[in-house]
Structures are given as structure tokens and as C-alpha cells.
Amino acid sequence: YTSLIIFAPMQKIGILGGGQLGRMLLQAAANYPVETFVLENDNECPAAHLCHHFTRGDIKDFDAVYNFGKGLDAITIEIENVNVDALEILEAEGVKIFPKPSVLKTIKNKILQKQYYELHQIPSPKFIITNNLAELNKQEEFLPAVHKVGEGGYDGKGVQLLKTKEDFLKGFDAPSVLEKMVNIHKEIAQMVNKIKKGETALYPPVEMLFNHQLNLLDFQLCPAELEQKTLWKVEAIALAVVRNFKS
């Protein structure tokens, strides 16, 4: 009796970004037969010492992203501020990209996000698009509001609370969203997974507790304490957001 064992080559998986989330991705990837690659500007980033191969480079730079990805089987991200143009070309050349570049274009741009919500009737605060400070200065009647720069803002950057016209000096002289301020009882984050077949999975929602001076996350409470009917609403909205994206 002879048995034949065939070993398939390990899949080469790239991650754009080497921060804490990239490190957690690598910890999960350790359970699978994959070879991991990370692209990040900092040699001492949290993910640098857990991946099989580390490349120093700017995840927003076309050449850096394209050259990093052209020998890989699949690429994913730990942050949305990446060069989507390079990912589109890599996808056309056969590299699997998760999430798809077409989805990333919306995810990384708050203006496109708001228009996406509006198109698909997903609940969201009222908003106005401002292309520069001159346009922002005409919106005193819309206050109080939150000004969010269209692209590039994260971890407290690119967000300003505007209560009076004098606060317009803190606004952004770039394409941005001016979002009507709402009273927040709790801020909830809901993770959803979707595969090509359209199947979805929901993870327990978490409550986000922010430092309101720095607009930075202080703590997450998991699972969030929610009434059942509120949980159903959270899940329904999250599923609507994900299902309207084309796989």
C-alpha cells in the first residue's frame, strides 16, 4: 500500500501597514500555511518582527505598493489609506485583493462614504460637502457640526468640532464633509465579514469610548451592552452597508 501526499505551495499573503492591526492579522495567520509579507515605512513597527518578510516602503506610494504586491497571491490592508491605483492594476494582473479596490475607494473617502449611505438609504447624519474654507465659511446656519477631511484623517486627525463661526478657522481647506452634530448616547462598532458567495458573518459589537479633546479612542467595551432591539438595528444597518458593496 502506497500513499501519495501532495504539498501545495504556501500562499503568499501581503499586508499593507504594519501597526497593531497588522500584528494581530499576523497572529491569526500563524494558524494557516501561509507566507506573510508586510509593507510599512517603519522598521520597528509592531508587525515587522512577526512576518516572514518585511519591506520598508510607503503604503500610499504607487511604485512601493505595486512592486511589493506583484509577486504575491493576495493582499489585504490594516488601514484604508493605501494607494488604490496600484491595487487596481495588481488585481487586473491576477493578485487577489481584500477588500476589493473598488470598495476601498469608498471606504477611504468620507465624501464617497456619505454619498454611498445616501444612495442606499442607510441612516446617517445630514451633511454638506465643502471643497475649501471659502465654502465652509458660508455654512454658519448648519452649525453645530463636525468637519471631516475627505481623505487621510485617522486617530484624531482630520476631524474638528465646529460650534460657532469662529471655529471655522479650525476647518479644512480641502474637500471635506460637514456633518450635522448629533447627540450620541453610545458609539458602537460592528464588524461584518462577507465572502464572494454573499455569505456574511457578524461579530459581537463593541462600544467605543473616546477622548473628546483629542478625538481618540480610549477604550473598547466588548461586547457592547445593548438592548436586544438595538442590537438588531445595529446588525441590520451593518449588513445593509456591506451587502450593497459589489463583491
PLM features: what roles do these ranges have?
Residues D58-F62, V84, L133, K165, ...:
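Structural motif corresponding to alpha-helix initiation and N-cap regions
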Residues G158-S247:
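Internal nucleotide-binding/catalytic subdomain
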Residues P99-G158, K165:
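A conserved helix-loop-beta module that forms one wall/lid of the active-site cleft
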Residues F37, T76, I97-F98, P125, ...:
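Structural detector of well-ordered beta-strand residues that form the stable sheet scaffold
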Residues H53-G57, E93-V95, Q115-E118, A145, ...:
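Short, hinge-like loop/turn segments at secondary-structure boundaries
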Residues I6-V103, I107-K108, L112:
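ATP-binding N-terminal substructure of ATP-dependent carboxylate-amine bond-forming enzymes
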